[in-house]
Amino acid sequence: MSNEREKVRMQHRGRGPMGRGMQPGEKPKDLKSSLGKLLSYIGNFKAAIIVVMIFAAASTVFNVIGPKTLGKATTALSEGLMAKIQGTGSIDFTYIGQILLFVLGLYVCSAAFNFIQGWIMTGVTQKICYRMRKEISRKINRMPMKYFESRTYGEVLSRITNDVDTLGQGLNQSITTIITSVATLVGVLIMMLSISPLMTLIAIVILPISMALISFVVKKSQKYFKDQQEYLGHINGQVEEVYGGHLVIKAFNREKDTIEEFNRTNEILYQSAWKSQFLSGMMQPIMMFVGNLGYAAVALSGGLLAIRGTITIGDIQAFIQYVKNFTQPIQQIAQVINQVQSMAAASERVFEFLNEEEEDQTVEHPADVSAVTGTVDFDHVQFGYNPDQTIIKDFSAHVKPGQKIAIVGPTGAGKTTMVKLLMRFYDVNSGSIKLDGHDVRDFNRRELRDAFGMVLQDTWLFKGTIMENIRYGRLEATDEEVIAAAKAAHADHFIKTLPGGYQMELNEDASNVSQGQKQLLTIARVILADNKILILDEATSSVDTRTEVTIQKAMDNLMRGRTSFVIAHRLSTIRNADLILVMKDGDIVEQGNHEELLEKNGFYANLYNSQFEDVVA
């Protein structure tokens, strides 16, 4: 059992034998499949995206018409200047002014359409991110416990923060960039052909060279972008873990080990990020070099054609501008491909999470939990976190309504695992657990868990006031009921001594109250919830002896008339239990009340006596 729990712990840290961390060299998943899922996901915004495409195309059309129209003004200015020199005419400034006003109108319309499509696309992107975060949040609440025990918290949080942000930025920039780039490429090509097919052919020669270079860089960088996103999640997990446990790290002088462990992960992230960013940064210089070669060839051929009188000076000016505009969308596409890859890597991780197996929350004909009186039967229960390793081998017990049941045994005996099975955090491999004759699998999970109140060894309080944290047990409770619950848990006295009393704000990890006070607040929360069945997992292990005695009295009053399961290593706290189940290696080896088990002089008696021998020693 101890080995099994160690595996689970390492899985939770994300670096154990079954950790999810992606290793360097692992092949990336299908890029086309990821983009296909993303396109399918944003299908609800199809109308808005079509409008964006129309406005982006319109903006590009107005922008593309400008250079050729402006070239007419250059031609008119050149011809007028030559006529004035020769004495045969003058410069027609009226005609040139009309052309300039027309070009100004084109560019104003282009800017307006570009602004509108940008405004719409930003709204669409944020709605998609909002919807995706909402679905991830809902998904988290439907995930089985085993998922979270095999991953770091930071890795899960990275799906909601880093991955969704990366996806949103990619969508916002890539879609409009691709549309405008393609429209510009097609429009410029048409305008270039209308000026000179020969010069167009010279300019187009650079296109296959550009595409070949882009394909090469994309193929090389795709793997590193996926690694970068993956290990960013691991970094987040380690930072969260170190921050949460910094006192333990300092107490055991493990700063050096922690830093070394972080540096190893950070080195992998650095290598993947460096390579991906280096390769992506190579695209623009390469494309600019190829574009300049094409620009020089076009300028040379245009000069020769102008000498022959085939084209005008204004056409050369317009064509040179089009050559610049022709290479620009290719460069933009090269840049946006980097964003598309990051976006695809992020969407791959998000959809991978959204497609994870969920818990079955409801059943077709659920049993009525409101009729439960507290009878619990464990019938030959067998369970293992892994199918090939059974840790609960043959657990059977009958619990009557209102009984106080203590589950004791050495560390790793399976005590806490039984509680997880009872609340269906996991399902048994074989056998059954029944409440009032109904298998726990016949209840809806949410309703089943409403029947239980829990006080865990690891207390958990939320950021908020003390009043809000206690009221979490029953949200509709009045202030008077909250205070009454605090008094029953013997928490009222210390709460009133705190600055702000019940309105004192707890920070994120509730470090502004002591561990014992945290325990009292969680007990008050359970008292307020007033559940039919109670589970106390090491409930008083973090409280001093004097406080433990007072809490024990309050808990005895609370448990009267309710079925209660108590897990405790300090056997002195459960001597008044109606039934004590003694577990060893996943089996019930003894059961009975305290006096009966001592008379047997068996495993329980050895445990009980050894604790007091340790105290005397």
For every predicted segment, state its role.
Residues N44, A48-V61, K72, Q173-D227, ...:
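Transmembrane helices of ABC transporter permease
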Residues M191-V205, K275-E348, F353-L354:
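Helix-loop-helix
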Residues I49-F113, S194-L198, G309-I313:
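Transmembrane helix-loop-helix hairpins at lipid-water interfaces of multipass membrane proteins
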Residues G21-E26, Q126, K134-S158, N162-V164, ...:
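Short intracellular "coupling" helices and adjacent cytoplasmic loop segments at the cytosolic face
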Residues T362-V363, V369-A617:
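ABC-type nucleotide-binding domain
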